[in-house]
Amino acid sequence: MKLRRLPNGDLEVTTRKGNIYRAVDLHNGWFNIWDEQREEVVVMIQYMDEFFETIAYREFHLN
């Protein structure tokens, strides 16, 4: 995964397959990736500078 900080503080997440998702900043070191089709949070990311940890939420994996 490749992460890029957006001007509004959110993250742009690019997967190995080239899919792009937006991770919303929760302002506590965590970011949610929202799946619009499922209407639910599918992944939570903890981001600190260039280090990040991805925690799968439910059984959805980003492609």
Q: What do the PLM-derived regions correspond to, one by one?
A:
Residues 14-57:
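Acidic, low-complexity, intrinsically disordered interaction modules
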Residues 1-14:
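Negatively charged, low-complexity tracts enriched in Asp/Glu with abundant Ser/Thr
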Residues 1-2, 59-63:
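Short intrinsically disordered terminal tails
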